[in-house]
Amino acid sequence: GVWQFAYMIAKYTGRNPLDYWGYGCWCGLGGKGNPVDAVDRCCYVHDVCYNSITQGPRPTCSRIAPYHKNYYFTGKKCSTGWLTSKCGRAICACDIAAVKCFRRNHFNKKYRLYKKNIC
């Protein structure tokens, strides 16, 4: 869920998770236009990942699951134990991929709290 994603961001990037809220055109709720840089592209890919597990004829998760569904992870891996559902593992995989992407790319302060109307 949201809190687990926030924890991952803080732990693996060393940044406050709120730094990513409103970053560029895609970080935070919704998104439009072209990503402004590599970090914003991480958010775009994260949105695409969530869409892939919540849409289509046989979705793995409900549309709201990514915001409340708990999952289990150790280190940088999603748990495959009996406590974690298929949906939870899918959400976890999307979140871990995003965090690894954030960590690989430069955070540019000029894109924090970016004006979405220019996207």
Swiss-Prot record:
> What residue range is the signal peptide?
none
Task: List the CDD domains hit by this protein, alphabetically.
Answer: PLA2c
Intrachain S-S bonds: C25-C119, C27-C43, C42-C101, C49-C94, C61-C87, C78-C92
Q: Where in the cell is it found?
A: Secreted; Nematocyst
- Report residues binding Ca(2+): G28, G30, D47
The protein's UniProt keywords, in alphabetical order, are: Blood coagulation cascade inhibiting toxin, Disulfide bond, Hemostasis impairing toxin, Hydrolase, Inflammatory response, Metal-binding, Myotoxin, Nematocyst, Secreted, Toxin
| Source superkingdom | Eukaryota
Q: What Pfam families does the record tag this protein with? A: Phospholip_A2_1
Q: Where is the active site?
A: H46, D95
Q: Can you name one GO molecular function term for this protein?
A: calcium-dependent phospholipase A2 activity
Q: Which PROSITE patterns match?
A: PA2_ASP, PA2_HIS
**GO-annotated biological processes:** arachidonate secretion; lipid catabolic process; phospholipid metabolic process; venom-mediated edema in another organism; venom-mediated myocyte killing in another organism; venom-mediated suppression of blood coagulation
Gene3D superfamilies reported for this sequence: Phospholipase A2 domain
A Gene Ontology term for the protein's cellular component = nematocyst
Q: What class of enzyme is it?
A: hydrolase
Cofactor, how bound (note): Binds 1 Ca(2+) ion per subunit.
**Which reaction(s) does the protein catalyse, per the Swiss-Prot or TrEMBL entry?**
a 1,2-diacyl-sn-glycero-3-phosphocholine + H2O = a 1-acyl-sn-glycero-3-phosphocholine + a fatty acid + H(+)
Query: Per its UniProt record, what InterPro entries does this chain match?
Result: PLipase_A2, PLipase_A2_Asp_AS, PLipase_A2_dom, PLipase_A2_dom_sf, PLipase_A2_His_AS
Summarize subunit and interaction data from the UniProt record for this chain.
Answer: Homodimer.
**Misc. remarks from the entry:** Lacks hemolytic activity.
General function of this protein: Sea anemone phospholipase A2 (PLA2). When incubated with plasma, this protein shows a moderate anticoagulant activity (0.15 ug of enzyme/200 uL of plasma), inhibiting clotting induced by thrombin. This enzyme also induces myotoxicity, and edema. PLA2 catalyzes the calcium-dependent hydrolysis of the 2-acyl groups in 3-sn-phosphoglycerides.
Q: What is this protein called?
A: Phospholipase A2 A2-actitoxin-Cgg2a
